[in-house]
Amino acid sequence: MTFVSLGFITGLSLILAIGAQNIFVIEQGIKKQFVFIVCLICAVSDLLLIFTGIFLFEYFQNFFNQTIELIFNLLLLLFLLYFIISKFREKHKEINLNTEIAKISFKNVFLKTIGFTYLNPHVYSDTVFFLGNFSKNFELTDKIYFGLGASTASFIFFYLLGYASNYFSNFLNNKMSWK
């Protein structure tokens, strides 16, 4: 098995779990709002974090202690509480399946995408720590190939997720499909 395919399979196996970030990508796909940009931000962020983990794992392993982990978890908690509160506020509004009316600003989508990406502790555990630890004994060129494989999996996954939900949005926006 080549290091590219090893990175691809390993990266894909880590990203397949449906968490807050992936649900947000699906939601943006269903709404048909900034799908390309949301997927790009998620995939490029993964690429940066994957290569950061591969080449700086030893440093991060010593830097991240329980205090830093607690700070990240508290930031994530605050972000998720804000998101939940905003969803509760929308709860009393009638569900609007018309994607043309329900548009939100680019800035709002951008900030939410950045929040779901960088305030998510699983992003760091998967990209920086797991992939970094997995590849720590690889030669330099093998690390690059491994990172390219994992990053390719991320790009394919996010764009497939975003545009598949966009493609199926008419079905998913049908009130009968949710009953």
Segments predicted by a language model, with ranges:
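Flexible interhelical linker loops that connect adjacent transmembrane helices
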Residues: H92-N108
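Alpha-helical transmembrane segments and their lipid-water interface positions
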Residues: S45-F57, F83, Y124, F157-S165
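Selective transmembrane alpha-helices of multi-pass membrane proteins
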Residues: F64-I95, S151-L161, S169-K179
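Small-residue packing motifs within transmembrane alpha-helices
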Residues: F3, G7, E69, N73, ...
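Juxtamembrane transmembrane-helix termini in multi-pass membrane transport proteins
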Residues: T2-T67, V128-Y145
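Hydrophobic/aromatic residues within the transmembrane alpha-helices of Major Facilitator Superfamily
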Residues: F8, L12, L16, I85, ...
